[in-house]
Amino acid sequence: MENNIDTQLELAISTRNTYNESEAELYIGYSSEKSTWQLLIRYNDDISDLVERYRMQIYYLLAGYAIIEISEAYLNAFAADPRIIYIDKPKSVEQQVSYAQYASCLSGTFINNYGLDGDGTIFAIIDSGIDYRHNEFVRDGKSRILSFWDQQAVYQDTYANTYKLGRIYTNEELNSILDGSYAGILPSEDRSGHGTQVAAIAAGTNIGVAPQTELLVVKIGSDTASKLPTTLGLILGIDYAIRTGIEMNRPISINLSYGNN
């Protein structure tokens, strides 16, 4: 195989015929029904001809990255093109909040000595979701969440988004949920409570470090086969957050309390 292919991807392809359930992590991103891989790539120049030649699905990210779905039969030929710098397979991610608190210099008792409250900024939480009804994310009966992208929701053209994944709830929709006038499908719950905890520590109305910031929430999607949150959902969330900050011309901070090492 080409040397720009992730070694885990090489191993997965070479051992797939001997697959067993204990190695599910290795095959994250592979669809046995379609014999395709969902992958993260880094590339140079225009690759639209490769998209057509290898019948790929592609979503272009910022800074020369993209997420593709490609048939395994075409992978080596695609990787051999000099415009393809690197190909990485998705990996699972796990909840990790304790080290994030340590790295942020947050102890059990936090005192804000700087007079900074996040006013005028956006705080993005890419995690397990959020309890959007919690009073830490509501002020004067209105949601402080600018948007909530539930990657695990069923995608519908009625509520189309550029990623063709999940459902993005607007601030107006969240407000109508709070006042009881919303008649649509509700966002999925934060069953683990991890994202809600992270958001409250960082930006809760009453207890947060930045109580005046507005929130952008992404609930990370899961791999179809393993049901595990993956790096692809994480990367899409980062892309969405950065694009939102650029579009609104506002500074944005991104919290990632998920990881895999």
Which residues does each predicted region cover?
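Autoinhibitory N-terminal propeptides
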Residues: 1-63, 76-112, 135, 223
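Short, flexible loop/turn elements at secondary-structure junctions
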Residues: 45, 72, 91, 130, ...
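Ligand-binding face of N-terminal immunoglobulin V-set domains in extracellular IgSF glycoproteins
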Residues: 68
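Subtilisin-like serine protease catalytic core
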Residues: 111-232, 247-253
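Short, well-ordered amphipathic alpha-helical segments that serve as non-catalytic structural scaffolds
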Residues: 236-240
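Short acidic, glycine-rich surface-loop motifs adjacent to enzyme active sites
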Residues: 241-261
